[in-house]
UniProtKB/Swiss-Prot annotation:
Coiled coil feature spans: none
Gene3D superfamilies (UniProt xref): ATP-grasp fold, B domain (3.30.470.20), Phosphorylase Kinase, domain 1 (3.30.200.20)
Protein name in UniProt: Phosphoribosylaminoimidazole-succinocarboxamide synthase
CDD domains: SAICAR_synt_PurC (cd01415)
Lineage of source species: Bacteria, Bacillati, Cyanobacteriota, Cyanophyceae, Synechococcales
Species this protein is from: Synechococcus sp. (strain CC9902)
Keyword check for Ligase: yes
Annotated family: Belongs to the SAICAR synthetase family.
Amino acid sequence: MTPDHGPLLYEGKAKRVFALAETDRVLVEFKNDATAFNAQKKAQLDDKGRLNCQISARLFELLEQHDVPTHYCGLVDDTWMQVRRVEIIPLEVVLRNVATGSLCRQTPIAEGTGLNPALFDLYYKDDALGDPLLTEARVQLLGVVKADRLSAIEQLARRVNEILCPFFAAIDLQLIDFKLEFGVTSGGELLLADEISPDTCRLWDRRSSDVNDRILDKDRFRKDLGGVMEAYGEVFKRVQSQCPNPRNCL
């Protein structure tokens, strides 16, 4: 069911954002579109939107229970959630607990190396530039955020990692790395935004020792491993076992 909403405000690779009568809130629809390599690889995956929406809702609520401020208000339907309206900061914030992916391609660090403390990486959110890796000095040069706001972002991101790592470990998942986005309300409040799902997290199954079978995230799509939705469904099943009843806005 499509809920009542106002005009489309923004459409990204995985979500659409619609206006609401309450100007401080918006509706987010999670799509079935799958993309990789800056949208060079595309596909439609049935049920992806529902699974990512439902996983994100539960993880946002988990984080709020640990005093992490998020934009999440509640579910509206299987693929829709209501969130607080924010201006997204054009930074992709990545926390890495285990070396893999681009970190291993760009450095001599061996695949699977544990990173303690977690590596905090920043990427400029710009498709035309390929979302380049930034230093903190470049963030300041670009004027993306001030130093104190960047410090607050890092503090929140590390807090999210501290909460999610043991949560996932309890359901036999290892949080390898993940991407976060943050936004600012009209009143200047910093909130965790976007989503937290197998699209944005690398999750390895502790119940499997096979290097491909253990992957339960978007890397299955990136690497043509198959079983993408089965993997997302398994993540949802385990998350739901700990967080069964997310709130809704109906």
